[in-house]
């Protein structure tokens, strides 16, 4: 097992140590072991989860929703995990629809500056 500290986990995921520590406090991540000095050690599965959580957060999924999913996954509660995944998939689908609607609206915007009242006599 590859085990590495918070600083390496953060570096590999491209986030700050502060983000990793925040996610630890929220229960989104858990160390797989601790050093004799009490520092958490993380494995490749933790890195994968961190990358998933960060991508989901950047896509607009709230940390509370992600924490519910992570708790269900950590508890090996298959029914709850499936329910949380279904909710996230619904959110993603709604977001895709909203972005598609926005794309249509963007296509209809004029590319030239509008001439307003200042051009009136």
UniProtKB/Swiss-Prot annotation:
Residues 6-25 bind DNA. Keywords: DNA-binding, Mercuric resistance, Plasmid, Transcription, Transcription regulation, Transposable element. Residues 3-72 form the HTH merR-type domain. InterPro entries: DNA-bd_dom_put_sf, MerD, MerR-type_HTH_dom, MerR_fam. GO terms for molecular function: DNA binding; DNA-binding transcription factor activity. One of its GO terms (biological process) is response to mercury ion. CDD domains: HTH_MerD. It comes from the Bacteria. Gene3D superfamilies: 1.10.1660.10. NCBIfam families: coreg_MerD, MerD. This is HTH-type transcriptional regulator MerD. It comes from Pseudomonas aeruginosa. The gene is merD.
